[in-house]
Amino acid sequence: MDPLMAVLCLLPLYPGLATAALSCPKNVNISGGSFTLSNGWNPGSILTYSCPLGHYPYPVVTRLCKSNGQWQIPRSTRSTKAICKPVRCPAPVSFENGVYIPRLGSHPVGGNLSFECEDGFTLRGSAVRQCRPNGMWDGETAVCDNGASHCPNPGISVGAVRTGSRFGLGDKVRYRCSSNLVLTGSAERECQDDGVWSGTEAICRQPYSYDFPEDVAPALGTSFSHLLATTNPIQQKKKQNLGRKIQIQRSGHLNLYLLLDASQSVSKDDFEIFKDSASRMVDRIFSFEIKVSVAIITFASKPKIIMSVLEDRSRDVTEVENSLRNINYKDHENGTGTNIYEALHAVYIMMNNQMNRPHMNPGAWQEIRHAIILLTDGKSNMGGSPKVAVDNIKEVLNINQKRKDYLDIYAIGVGSLHVDWKELNNLGSKKDGERHAFILKDVQALSQVFEHMLDVSQLTDPICGVGNMSANASAQERTPWHVTIKPKSQETCRGALISDQWVLTAAHCFRNAEDRTLWRVSVGDPNFQGSKEFQIEEAVISPGFNVFSKKSQGIPEFYGDDIALLKLTQKVKMSTHARPICLPCTVGANLALRKLPGSTCRDHEKELLNQVSIPAHFVALNGDKLNINLKTGSEWTNCVKVVLKDKTTFPNLTDVREVVTDQFLCSGTQGDDSPCKGESGGAVFLERRLRFFQVGLVSWGLYNPCGGSSKNSRKPAPHGKVPRDFHINLFRLQPWLRQHLEGILNFVPL
């Protein structure tokens, strides 16, 4: 062997002579901002810049430490010095039939634009708009219109130029953006028969602009709402513009395709947020009574099909969530590219295979609706144009003007600088009054979107057990079934909407008030205009209820059969503040629990009261949701025996079952909250699969924690006083409920 080669072969054996591990230079500070590293200074690490609100990183938001120990050089710029630049909003290029001020080349964050119309024209949209820290104007496009055409004046968004000034049937308008701005929405729109413009509004935005979570969440939240709102052909034919997003008849079927970017620029932590966001969407969709199949595709240089809609397990929420949870970040470890085309092409192949299945009925195939959710952090850089794959998908689904509602593509980009607005816009669906393409600043914003998107305000049918669980929802929105029952102006009891016209409450609320025409039921949030008072058309009190029935036995009060139904004089309009809760043993609850057809009331009880201690809730006087633990089985016995020790209330009681029968659920241990006087009749409820079910109603207790004047102040029980609370168990009063709610609710077999 050559002596020199021999020496070289031995070099790795000596630590002092070993090659040093590569690392990227540390001179990457950003002026005015900060940065984070996904894996230190090692090759493969992603550097992410961040700037204060109202500023953006320039020239890039991320950089990759390459395998040669050098930072990736930003494309399309010679500058490698990172700085935080101030955000600016674009200026109007033109404004028809009116004037605007001030006239600047661009506008700083916080700056205002004011619009005013000429005589004979009416202003539609926002008269004053403010530049927001994300580079977007708040409000809506200002338009001066005289209403003289078949379609309304489509307007000209800030920074846009329009060609076409005729708005009659069949007329077209075209848009382009001024220099350095990016067009999102439809570049061309046509005036249609129904007086609505095709496509979606053209908006011109700065390349570095992004969407706030509070803007994206309502759009996606409405998607879920209208997925449920289209419940039958009659409702579909209504001409109300409800902003239909992902839409499906409950008798139909939805194919949901989740496409998750796993390319090298996505860190492991960020990919976990992608997975978590997809899981939230899946969980929410499966919480409603619709038929859905889910496909999961991850992609980098190549796609990987985790789950196909052709598989039976794609219709099982547990299987879908397990598949999402078990996706391995390292599956695409060697994939450096972002191949959105191949990911969408995999969806196309899946659709084609389903359509050509031997047993697939052509009519049934035509009725399947399809929604594609793309989560990506970058521009497609290999595999060809993703738009080609979208066109193929539209062809196989026969998407035309009449069938446009059968396909929705949502393109969600994360990272305002390295996501291509133009590409996302080309991929997202274009439908009037809707948005399907979004860019969020970072994955944390994406997570916020899926936390806040659960808005049910647009659901017009009385689907049960749906509460708005987003972080910014009011107390009433979280428990929209909760109502207040009062004679004249004094509040005395609570109740729960169980349909759009019936309220379930406690019988003892009415023992001292015979003239029920004076009573009112307040539905909705008293802090909002949506609150409304209803008169009672009919009160159905359980004939078995008589609070003094055991007085001769030395028992001053007995609350057996403490249940009542109230029929309101009018139906309640469904909204985010007013919606019924699910009553167990009904068909609605069976669907919400995802139980099979043929399931029984006993099956519901096993599902909902399946432990000896069950976390549950009731609503306090101030609207807060408070926590209790319902006791069953052996724990029920231990819970109720405390009554024997309360000699103040029951001085001569020897058998606890004389006052606490098996009609009652028991709570009050484990530091539970205790209901106050005035909270009687309210629902005792629990959550399963993002839906809410009433298993009991507040009846009576040994201690009133609200003895003071303030309804916001709850005092702990004094020394020697053991609190216990008892709630009517709705599973024990099924015959009575079925007798009086027949034809109002559909019940499953006992």
Swiss-Prot record:
Please give the InterPro entries that the UniProt record associates with this protein: Compl_C2_B (IPR011360), Peptidase_S1_PA (IPR009003), Peptidase_S1_PA_chymotrypsin (IPR043504), Peptidase_S1A (IPR001314), Sushi/SCR/CCP_sf (IPR035976), Sushi_SCR_CCP_dom (IPR000436), Trypsin_dom (IPR001254), TRYPSIN_HIS (IPR018114)
Sites where a glycan is attached: N29, N112, N334, N468, N472, N652
Q: Which cofactor does it need?
A: Mg(2+); Mn(2+)
The UniProt record lists the keyword Metal-binding? yes
Q: Provide the active-site residues from the annotation.
A: H508 (charge relay system), D562 (charge relay system), S680 (charge relay system)
Is the keyword Zinc in the record?
no
Q: Where is the VWFA domain?
A: 255-453
Which compartments does it reside in? Secreted; Cell surface
Write out the PTM section of this UniProt entry.
Cleaved and activated by different proteases depending on the complement pathway to generate complement C2a and serine protease complement C2b chains. Cleaved and activated by C1S following activation by the classical complement system. Cleaved and activated by MASP2 following activation by the lectin complement system. Cleaved and activated by GZMK following activation by the GZMK complement system.
Q: Identify the keywords attached in UniProt to this record, alphabetized.
A: Complement pathway, Disulfide bond, Glycoprotein, Hydrolase, Immunity, Innate immunity, Magnesium, Manganese, Metal-binding, Protease, Repeat, Secreted, Serine protease, Signal, Sushi
Domain of life the protein comes from: Eukaryota
Residues carrying the site annotation Cleavage: R244, K245
Q: Where in the numbering of this chain does the Sushi domain appear?
A: 22-86, 87-146, 149-206
- Can you supply a Gene Ontology BP term from the record? complement activation
| Principal subcellular localization | secreted
Annotated signal sequence is 1-20
Q: Where is the Peptidase S1 domain?
A: 465-742
Assigned GO CC terms: extracellular region
Fill in the domain comment. Answer: The MIDAS-like motif in the VWFA domain binds divalent metal cations.
Q: Which family does it belong to?
A: Belongs to the peptidase S1 family.
Name of this protein:
Complement C2
